C-alpha cells in the first residue's frame, strides 16, 4: 500500500501523460492558425511587436520549465537537442510549423514512462536506511542529469526522501494519538 501511495505521489503531476493514450500529433490546421497568430501579433498587438528571437527564447524557456520545472525528467542531451530551436520558434511559427512542442512532449512522455518504471522497480527493492545521504529537493537551478545513471540516482534519493517523509509522518501521528 505504501509503495503504491508513494509512486502515485511522486508521479501525480504526470498522470495526464498516461491517460492520453497515443502520442498527439499536430492537426493540419494548426499551422494555419500559427501563421495567423504570428501575423496578428505584429499587426494588432498594442506594442506592435512581432515574433522575434527574444520572444522565441522566452517561449522556449517557458515551455521547458512547464514540462520539467525541477530538472528531473529531461536529460542534458535532451536539452541540448532542443537548444537548436531556442531562437527559431518564431521562425517556425511564422512558417506554420508547430512540430517542436510536440517533439518536446514526445520526449517528455518517454522520460515519464521511464521514470515510472524506475520508481516501480525501486519500490519493489526497498531502501537502505542506514546510509547518510543528502537530497536537494528544489532543483530549478540545478544542472540537468548527464545520463540515466545520474537521473536514476537523483530519483532514488527523491523517492527515498518521500518514503522517509511518510514513515516519519506516520510515526508522529501515532505518537500524538
Predicted regions and their residues:
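Flexible, low-complexity junctional segments that flank or bridge functional domains
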Residues: 18-177
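Bacterial N-terminal signal peptides
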Residues: 4-16
Amino acid at each position: 500500500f505504501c509503495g503504491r501511495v508513494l509512486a502515485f505521489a511522486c508521479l501525480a503531476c504526470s498522470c495526464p501523460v498516461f491517460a492520453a493514450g497515443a502520442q498527439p500529433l499536430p492537426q493540419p490546421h494548426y499551422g494555419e492558425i500559427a501563421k495567423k497568430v504570428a501575423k496578428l501579433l505584429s499587426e494588432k498587438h498594442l506594442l506592435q511587436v512581432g515574433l522575434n528571437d527574444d520572444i522565441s527564447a522566452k517561449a522556449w524557456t517557458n515551455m521547458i520549465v512547464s514540462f520539467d520545472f525541477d530538472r528531473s525528467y529531461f536529460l542534458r542531451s535532451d536539452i541540448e537537442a532542443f537548444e537548436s530551436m531556442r531562437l527559431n520558434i518564431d521562425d517556425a511559427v511564422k512558417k506554420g510549423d508547430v512540430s517542436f512542442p510536440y517533439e518536446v512532449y514526445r520526449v517528455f512522455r518517454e522520460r515519464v514512462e521511464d521514470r515510472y518504471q524506475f520508481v516501480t522497480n525501486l519500490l519493489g527493492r526497498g531502501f537502505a536506511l542506514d546510509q547518510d545521504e543528502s537530497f536537494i529537493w528544489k532543483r530549478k537551478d540545478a544542472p540537468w542529469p548527464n545520463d540515466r545513471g545520474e537521473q536514476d540516482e537523483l530519483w532514488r534519493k527523491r523517492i527515498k526522501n518521500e518514503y522517509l517523509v511518510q514513515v516519519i509522518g506516520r510515526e508522529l501521528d501515532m505518537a500524538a494519538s
